[in-house]
Swiss-Prot record:
PANTHER family: TRNA(ILE)-LYSIDINE SYNTHASE-RELATED
Free-text comment about domains: The N-terminal region contains the highly conserved SGGXDS motif, predicted to be a P-loop motif involved in ATP binding.
EC number per UniProt: 6.3.4.19
Stated name of the protein: tRNA(Ile)-lysidine synthase, chloroplastic
Molecular function in Gene Ontology: ATP binding; tRNA(Ile)-lysidine synthase activity
Gene name tied to this protein: tilS
Amino acids binding ATP: 31-36
Organism: Cyanidium caldarium (Red alga)
Length: 314
């Protein structure tokens, strides 16, 4: 085994594992592309040292005519590596990426929980995370939802977590490892369907931004998400302390301290009202509706206002 920079990064991921879970069971979602094969190569190189049982799972969306041949190639690869192989094929047509992703994770979680596996490994790279960040930014998602993209471990249950061992490497790195190891890559032409939004970002927008604005765009977005995540954690700690002083319970019900709320900066006011509205009424409102509510609170002369479930924003 030739140790490369990707092997060193992978070892850093192994050190993050719970020591009690090392040598246990792992499920790897496989597609046959360069990212998943690079992850399989790293797992096989350190299998005897760190890992116990491995299972490969291939989910066939049946978008391609040769998808069954792709599955057969992966099956032969699993036989060569002495790893169990599971194949799932959809019985209905999946018309969108969202439906395909939901169906794929449903099967991956099903087999992981059924056999009581410790980790579900996916081959998402830093390039995938960066592309998803841009995709969600242009769709005007909340910054907290973007921060959730950057994770190495996502705990589903006490005994199972989804893990991304390649979250710190780019797609160019995985291609280099596959070329160095002569791995049998399978070209997926659905990645070039430009009517899919994510493919258009990957094939057109992302290369344009890297070529003309920032050649290290993945690293920049990685730092952007990380710094925002730290700032958000700090902000949430402050807001929880403020929230406990502004909202409270009495015999008459839940009350809202108007006089103390008015002393806060407008930015804090907006976040407090938005998050409280979601926790209490389980939905989000538009920014214009929240601005009207904040304006109504500014005109309120009472010291405290009791909140009822029947209240609504016009």
């Amino acid at each position: 085994m030739k140790v490369t920079i990707l092997h060193q990064k992978f070892i850093r991921f192994v050190y993050l594992l719970d020591l009690e879970l090392i040598k246990r069971k792992f499920v790897l979602g496989l597609s046959g592309g360069q990212d998943s094969l690079a992850l399989l190569k790293l797992l096989c190189d350190y299998r005897k040292t760190y890992f116990g049982l491995l299972k490969l799972v291939y989910c066939d969306h049946r978008w391609r005519l040769e998808s069954i041949a792709n599955a057969q190639r992966l099956y032969y690869l699993s036989e060569y590596s002495n790893i169990s192989f599971y194949y799932f094929a959809t019985s209905t047509f999946l018309s969108s990426e969202t439906q395909s992703r939901t169906w794929r994770y449903k099967n991956l979680l099903k087999i992981s929980l059924s056999f009581e596996y410790s980790y579900l490994l996916t081959a998402h790279t830093l390039s995938d995370i960066s592309e998803t960040t841009i995709y969600r930014l242009v769709r005007n998602l909340r910054i907290s939802e973007i921060n959730n993209l950057l994770f190495t471990f996502l705990y589903i249950k006490k005994t199972l977590s989804i893990s991304r061992p390649l979250a710190s490497v780019t797609r160019n790195d995985t291609y280099w490892l596959c070329s160095l190891s002569y791995l049998p890559l399978w070209s997926d032409y659905t990645n070039y369907w430009l009517f899919l939004s994510r493919n258009r970002i990957r094939q057109e927008l992302f290369p344009y931004l890297k070529n003309y604005f920032n050649c290290s765009l993945e690293r920049y977005l990685d730092g952007f998400i990380y710094s925002n995540k730290i700032n958000l954690i700090t902000l949430n700690i402050k807001l929880k302390k403020i929230l406990s002083k502004i909202f409270g319970y009495t015999n008459d019900g839940l009350y809202f301290n108007v006089s103390l709320f008015k002393l806060l900066p407008f930015f804090y006011q907006h976040i407090l009202i938005r998050d409280f509205h979601f926790l209490f009424f389980h939905n989000y409102r538009s920014p214009s509706q929240f601005n009207r509510l904040l304006f109504a609170i500014a005109l309120e002369k009472s010291q405290k206002v009791f909140i009822r479930k029947q209240y609504h924003i016009i």
